[in-house]
Amino acid sequence: MAQCSGLPEMAKAYEAAEVEKKWYQYWMEKGYFKPNPDSDKKPFVIIMPPPNVTGELHLGHALTATLEDIMIRWHRMLGEPALWLPGADHAGIAAQVVVERMLAKQGKTRQELGRELFLEKMWEWVNPCRERIRHQHMRLGASCDWDRETFTLDPGPVKAVREIFTNLYQKGLIYRGERIINWCPRCATAVSDLEVDHKDLAGHIWHLRYPLEDGSGFVTVATTRPETMLGDTAVAVHPDDARYTGMVGKNVLLPIMNRRIPVIADEAVDMAFGTGAVKVTPAHDPNDFEMGLRHSLPMITIQNRDTTMNENAGPCSGMTAKACREYVVSELKSLGLLLKIEDYTHSVGHCQRCSAVIEPMVSKQWFVKMEPLAKPALEAVNSGRIQILPERFTKVYQNWMENIRDWCISRQLWWGHRIPVWYCPCGEMIVSKEDPTACPKCGSTKLEQDPDVLDTWFSSGLWPHSTLGWPDQTEDLKRFYPGSVLETAYDIIFFWVARMIVMGIEDMKEVPFRTVYLHGLIRDDKGEKMSKTKGNVIDPLKVIDQYGTDALRFAVTFGTSPGNDSKLGQTKLEAARNFVNKLWNASRFVIMNLGEEKELLPEAGLPLEDRWILSRMNRVTADVIRLMEEFQFGEAQRVLQDFVWGEFCDWYIELAKVRLRDEASVSPRPVLVKVLSTILRLLHPYMPFITEELWSYLRPYLPKSLGETDIIVAPFPQADETCFDEQAESIMGSLVEVVRSLRNLRAEHNVEISRYIQANIYAGDMAEVLSNYLGAVETLSRSRPVNILPGHYSGASTATEVVLVLNGIEVVVPMSTMVDLEAEAKRVEAEIAELETQIERLSARLSDTQFLAKAPQAVVDKERTKLEGYIEKVSRLKAV
């Protein structure tokens, strides 16, 4: 039958590009991406992790956007006011580096341009990037409320940043001081501890002799950086180290510099490292810095910010660090103070952005005092007010919070939130939410703002509430804070997640979200991390162009689970594309066979397969809801795919075809509509475009409440337990098992598609029920005639017949109906001969003592397993 005449003819193949453009524009025009203002239900809120403006869309973004869109679309279908607030991050150092490189190609520097003109160049580059990010998310089907889109340098976030900075400063939680920081010489800025990647590098450890001032001997120290000895202000030993008991309190003369420095005792010294005595350079080592504070040691900086040696380096002033090292080692050797050099592998910090070696350096910077802020953030997770998924990351979060250090928030950049601090020539420092016009102390108008900007993560930490209008008490803030779920990658739990919790509780006195869902990384199909150098990067936009958005979404989320990495390769992408095509073809078959009028679902008297598919549909619905509530979106997706392809398409539709050809049969159309409408709604969060397109064709056949609704806002299916039918599932299970066994038998014996096989089915008590489906068994298994008999068959397989023993059913198939027995006998005979040749060869090899002595055990075991397999196969073939 033809489909309803009021509808356009369905295309034979799914045209993704055309469908995606049409429906996304339609959803935007209808305002579906905005939270429903009329709903009295509790809002469901996700604030999008703002992607950096520097980046092209990659698979990580695709996974994030898809998982968040799944949640938003699901909760929208549950009737909740669903808000997904999008945005982008100004990306601080990463963005500035890109623009500076562009200027360098033109022979210009930011210093030559000046701050104002350079920032104009930044905005010229950033604005198109923001447009690109928005367009890329739209192509992914992201149902964000684009009218609420926020950029971290928009006026709202700028106001929020100044508010929190001023508040924390007034509480004594932000301070400016000389502290040891991580200095990136290439980016020319301080970076936080979290922005330093530690890599194990092969190096050396130098043992240096420092002479005691009283001439009584030497103290030998071990160091991996001999050039820093020029800034030493002490030698430290452990107070319990008996080797140095008499030396503590004495002085040594620092070689080359001839500076008198003390021998001190400190419990931080590792007695097992080197000689147990260490040089202390407070200005160039984090541990030494803390030791220097404890012992009031001078802090002598010997390097400039470009890592060349400064005037404090004595004879090495003006040298590079490498040249300085060579000079120091040579000089100590000539003085007889270099005891030995050993190979040594040690951890060296590198800038996460540019990979330059990080230089620990004492510098005047702005810091946040984290310990008082961390306590309530830790309690929020410990008390369960915030749940972290998977649970194992809770321990990671707790450990970091319990050992937190002060956060260096100033960056020597121009692009970002400029620190809201001004300096007056009179010495007054003004911290203000607004630009001051005059010094409150002397009245001077000659104020200079601090040149530094804030760490990008400082503004990102305010994201859940600054995007909703804070510090103003807006209606959005009242309605949508706190958020429901924070979904992001597990690798930024410290960078971003922890800081949002800290800032949210500080500003709002309430947690910023209830659940933290951490997804894993997407690796290639071999489990390798994707990188341009490896050539294994998959461009999601190219995948969309080739296979469509729904296929990409289905592929990136398939097999995912909270916190675990997943694999993605061509095989999975093609499988997702095939599922899209399967869904289209199956739906097209159903819709093209629905006729002109709606058919109502009978209240009773449904055939077995109808009761079975309705029972399975409701069980699958219950499973999907449970799994989605547990954030197991990958598993819910697998359950759905198995049902759609493995039960609805492969079995129910095939059985329905038999009835559609028989006018006397009970019509399967109402059940086809019921199940397909449920499938489309269950799949919509995962595959929004194809489901909306198919829904548009199905709507005329749906009940009025559904037929007048676009699927994006249609009610999400709920399981009806009264439809669970264990009897129907059991009987259909047997029917499916019989057909599948016959299909497998055909495949094993390479039976031509045009050839029918014969079968006797001994079904015991189920014979009468299965007899009602004789035609279906014959059609689906390409078997004819099929005899369904009572009782059971006790015989075994022979050369003339195959006996398949199923669950309480025996299927007997004469070999003559599948193969030419004479030709088959010759084939088996030839196969046995070949196998026996292999057995003879392997037996000889495994009897060879030289082979057994020289070959790896794994190779021997592999050969032995192969031999056993050949022997078992010969035995099986001879038995037949």
Curated annotation (Swiss-Prot):
It is found in: Cytoplasm. PROSITE patterns: AA_TRNA_LIGASE_I. A motif ('HIGH' region) lies at residues 51-61. GO terms for cellular component: cytosol. Its EC number is 6.1.1.9. It catalyses: tRNA(Val) + L-valine + ATP = L-valyl-tRNA(Val) + AMP + diphosphate. A motif ('KMSKS' region) lies at residues 529-533. Keywords: Aminoacyl-tRNA synthetase, ATP-binding, Coiled coil, Cytoplasm, Ligase, Nucleotide-binding, Protein biosynthesis. GO terms for molecular function: aminoacyl-tRNA deacylase activity; ATP binding; valine-tRNA ligase activity. GO terms for biological process: valyl-tRNA aminoacylation. Residues 815-854 form a coiled coil. Its main location: cytoplasm. It comes from the Bacteria. InterPro entries: aa-tRNA-synth_I_CS, aa-tRNA-synth_Ia, Anticodon_Ia_Val, M/V/L/I-tRNA-synth_anticd-bd, Rossmann-like_a/b/a_fold, tRNA-bd_arm, tRNAsynth_Ia_anticodon-bd, Val-tRNA_synth_C_sf. ATP binds at residue 532. NCBIfam families: PRK05729.1, valS. ValRS has two distinct active sites: one for aminoacylation and one for editing. The misactivated threonine is translocated from the active site to the editing site. Monomer. Belongs to the class-I aminoacyl-tRNA synthetase family. ValS type 1 subfamily. Catalyzes the attachment of valine to tRNA(Val). As ValRS can inadvertently accommodate and process structurally similar amino acids such as threonine, to avoid such errors, it has a 'posttransfer' editing activity that hydrolyzes mischarged Thr-tRNA(Val) in a tRNA-dependent manner. This is Valine--tRNA ligase. It comes from Dehalococcoides mccartyi (strain ATCC BAA-2266 / KCTC 15142 / 195) (Dehalococcoides ethenogenes (strain 195)). The gene is valS.
